Amino acid sequence: MASLVYGTPWLRVRSLPELAPAFLRRRQSSLFYCSRRSFAVVACSTPVNNGGSVRVRFAPSPTGNLHVGGARTALFNYLFARSKGGKFVLRIEDTDLERSTRESEAAVLQDLSWLGLDWDEGPGVSGDFGPYRQSERNALYKQYAEKLLESGHVYRCFCSSEELVKMKENAKLKQLPPVYTGKWATASDAEIEQELEKGTPFTYRFRVPKEGSLKINDLIRGEVCWNLDTLGDFVVMRSNGQPVYNFCVTVDDATMAISHVIRAEEHLPNTLRQALIYKALKFPMPQFAHVSLILAPDRSKLSKRHGATSVGQYREMGYLPQGMVNYLALLGWGDGTENEFFTLEDLVEKFSIERVNKSGAIFDSTKLRWMNGQHLRALPNEKLTKLVGERWKSAGILTESEGSFVNEAVELLKDGIELVTDSDKVLLNLLSYPLHATLASPEAKPAVEDKLHEVAASLIAAYDSGEIPSALEEGQGAWQKWVKAFGKSLKRKGKSLFMPLRVLLTGKLHGPEMGTSIVLIYKAGSPGIVVPQAGFVSMEERFKILREIDWEALNKDESVPLESTATVST
């Protein structure tokens, strides 16, 4: 809780009304509030008086999508609560009535659920501290605003918008902070009653000591201190009766028995106002922990101009929740080892707020993609195959999402997949046959010069005789046996055998395991496997293209007509 310290002049502090004699607790107590003493509040690291239990909250505003920075804040709160056996509370801060929508709220809830961050209290989950939307707690805010008015911590301010603008302009001319300097902080009862009778609109302003400092002990940043003379009296209730953000947050955190407030460092200025309200309402102070911002590679604040920034966007791009959670956890936290692969359960076990770094964390989309691939390949085969198979069918490549072809294709191609959406490209690449483009490339020249035309002639003869179709029909074992015999007949082995076969049968110089690839290409030619519009080049069509190759022109370094290249249309 916040504490006040009295002593020698350099430690002298200003009395707050709840500590002052009763005769000073009046709205017109101008002498008391005009005293120029110094003031200091220290937020000690002591838990809220809620039985010692840990209660944290994530409080998004439903005005848009869930940003990755917000998702990381939610994750750190979730991990802290779970690691301490505490409660993770979800509160919707929808006081911005013009921008807040239920559609945005639903999207945020969906993103949190997708990440696996289930909340113990909040929308859809009953609890003892509801309601959990700020728009449904207005009566509570008004109750505490009136309490502050009665104690003298806030006062009615009847300044017009024009007057406030003029104050800011004057402060700017004098190169002073734009703090409130209006007369209503020291107005008499008579002056106030006169304005009330006229029906003049007013706000509630919080009295801020004019000198001194406020300190908190942040769990991540250590001691943080502000000079109070830079703040000025701030509004807690607007003229339309709507409470402002800092007032709502303080009342909510206190009445919901929140023990730890873990949030982004951009909220540090809010902590100054909230700490003053805590003390004025005699609320116990929670422990604060302000995490660093997530930065773009150029060290500016991550924004839309840097690409995808919302959880929903990454979900639509094919990222897994496991990969997102793992990567977000490492943006400013580590367990002290070289390990970078964590499941959500691992993170709950190892997380500690003491290991959260106060320096800005760089968001590296390449690293996120790599990490997603690690989690994708760590999935059980059945789950991975289901994900990829459904993707291939929905993308219009395969007619079915399951079966032996899907199983074998996923097993062959999974090392080249980092996102589920990558699976389209790798399968289309397997099904394509860009032979002419490959033969025309400089990289293929050594293979062409190694009597590739002779291997092609022998291969065509073996296909026409039925040897190749027969071996492929029997499967991987029979195909390997045939390749070995074919190599002996040509007196070739190793690279001198396998490279020509890869080029001539797949149309490429590189790719996944050759034998399995060729067997799968043959199987893809069976009826009902590949969607006709997918651009698949069957084994029969490949040999037709092989027969039309002008090997003499190739050996003379003449250009190959690229219009005859067989590729998949994407």
From Swiss-Prot:
Its main location: plastid. It catalyses: tRNA(Glu) + L-glutamate + ATP = L-glutamyl-tRNA(Glu) + AMP + diphosphate. It is an enzyme of class 6 (ligase). It is found in: Plastid, Chloroplast; Mitochondrion. A motif ('HIGH' region) lies at residues 60-70. Keywords: Aminoacyl-tRNA synthetase, ATP-binding, Chloroplast, Ligase, Mitochondrion, Nucleotide-binding, Plastid, Protein biosynthesis, Transit peptide. It comes from the Eukaryota. Its EC number is 6.1.1.17. GO terms for cellular component: chloroplast; chloroplast stroma; mitochondrion; plastid. L-glutamate binds at residues 57-59, 93, 245-249, 263. Catalyzes the attachment of glutamate to tRNA(Glu) in a two-step reaction: glutamate is first activated by ATP to form Glu-AMP and then transferred to the acceptor end of tRNA(Glu). PANTHER family: GLUTAMATE--TRNA LIGASE, GLUTAMATE--TRNA LIGASE, MITOCHONDRIAL-RELATED. This is Glutamate--tRNA ligase, chloroplastic/mitochondrial. It comes from Arabidopsis thaliana.
